[in-house]
């Protein structure tokens, strides 16, 4: 029975990821005053299926000097971790209701760095390695602020369980009392998922294609799936943290619809940002985090810790 539950979680995620690629190409197309994919199927709706078929029936090439086992393990690990992170997400009921769900999410997102590092190193190519090192530095850096922002938000809900956030936000979304945190969180999620304007790992102008430059066919598709699964997951996480939908135990479907619409709007904003902004310079990216975000988030974290103590109201404990 548990396997059926797992499949019922994974299959819709993969479908959502497939159609997100189409939505992205369509949105970017219309923003550049062109149509986007419109040949395969009505309005290009079958494009993701054609793409998947094309990628998975191609020959998976690999460089002669590459480390074979690690070269193959890296994309599999990337997708596995991307899908594992969906386990504690309440939609409105999680697959496994973990006591330390948020800690689990942080741990998994940190492990995802390894797949990028291994792929760059195992390719035995200088461009792939530089791309991987950039990605690792960027991901690790932005995880610092993500963790501090999470801590500040959790002080308002009083529990590491994600489901508690739904109850906390019954009357007020947490984006209102903590909007500076929400803004920094959103920008950090962009950097964490390697999206424009932070897609320095895939700097086409200088690094060809970043850490996955030597990948082709199936393994490349797995990296692609992992990236887009992470984008949707991060937006769902953002919705849970800051834009909690109203949950009626008798009508959980209403919650799911409300929740999905918010997550989709956030995902569309990711695409909109990609169409609108040029890429950051690497030193600017690091400067933004270490000199701007980190001091601000630390100050706000101190504020969120001291406020309840000052008002003699300890954080809610569940």
Swiss-Prot record:
Identify one Gene Ontology CC term for this UniProt entry. Answer: mitochondrial inner membrane
EC code: 7.1.1.2
**TM ranges:** 2-22, 70-90, 100-120, 147-167, 171-191, 217-237, 253-273, 294-314
- Keyword Membrane on entry: yes
Membrane topology per the record? Multi-pass membrane protein
Q: Which biological process annotations from GO are given for this protein?
A: aerobic respiration; mitochondrial electron transport, NADH to ubiquinone; mitochondrial respiratory chain complex I assembly
Where, subcellularly, is it found?
Mitochondrion inner membrane
Reaction(s) catalysed by this chain, per the record, are: a ubiquinone + NADH + 5 H(+)(in) = a ubiquinol + NAD(+) + 4 H(+)(out)
Q: What does this protein do?
A: Core subunit of the mitochondrial membrane respiratory chain NADH dehydrogenase (Complex I) which catalyzes electron transfer from NADH through the respiratory chain, using ubiquinone as an electron acceptor. Essential for the catalytic activity and assembly of complex I.
User: What name appears for this protein in its UniProt entry?
Assistant: NADH-ubiquinone oxidoreductase chain 1
Native source organism of the sequence: Equus caballus (Horse)
């Amino acid at each position: 029975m548990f396997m059926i539950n797992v499949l019922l979680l994974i299959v819709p995620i993969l479908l959502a990821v497939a159609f997100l690629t189409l939505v992205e190409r369509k949105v970017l197309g219309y923003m550049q005053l062109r149509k986007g994919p419109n040949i395969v199927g009505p309005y290009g709706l079958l494009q993701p299926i054609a793409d998947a078929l094309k990628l998975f029936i191609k020959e998976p090439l690999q460089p002669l000097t590459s480390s074979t086992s690690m070269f193959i393990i890296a994309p599999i690990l990337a997708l596995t971790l991307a899908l594992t992170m969906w386990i504690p997400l309440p939609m409105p009921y999680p697959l496994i209701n973990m006591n330390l769900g948020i800690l689990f999410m942080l741990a998994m997102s940190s492990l995802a760095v390894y797949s990028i590092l291994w792929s760059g190193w195992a390719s035995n190519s200088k461009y792939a390695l530089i791309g991987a090192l950039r990605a690792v530095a960027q991901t690790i850096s932005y995880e610092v602020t993500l963790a501090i922002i999470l801590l500040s938000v959790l002080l308002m809900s009083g529990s590491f369980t994600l489901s508690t956030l739904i109850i906390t936000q019954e009357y007020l979304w947490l984006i209102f009392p903590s909007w500076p945190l929400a803004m920094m969180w959103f920008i950090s999620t962009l950097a964490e998922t390697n999206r424009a304007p932070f897609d320095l790992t895939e700097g086409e102008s200088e690094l060809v294609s970043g850490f996955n430059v030597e990948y082709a066919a199936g393994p490349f598709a797995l990296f692609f799936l992992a990236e887009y699964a992470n984008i949707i997951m991060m937006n769902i996480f953002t919705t849970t943290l800051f834009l909690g939908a109203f949950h009626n135990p008798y009508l959980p479907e209403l919650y799911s619809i409300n929740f999905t619409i918010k997550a989709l709007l956030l995902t569309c904003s990711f695409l909109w940002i990609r169409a609108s902004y040029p890429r950051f310079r690497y030193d600017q990216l690091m400067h933004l985090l270490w000199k701007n975000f980190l001091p601000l988030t630390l100050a706000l974290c101190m504020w969120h810790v001291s406020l309840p103590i000052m008002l003699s109201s300890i954080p809610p404990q569940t």
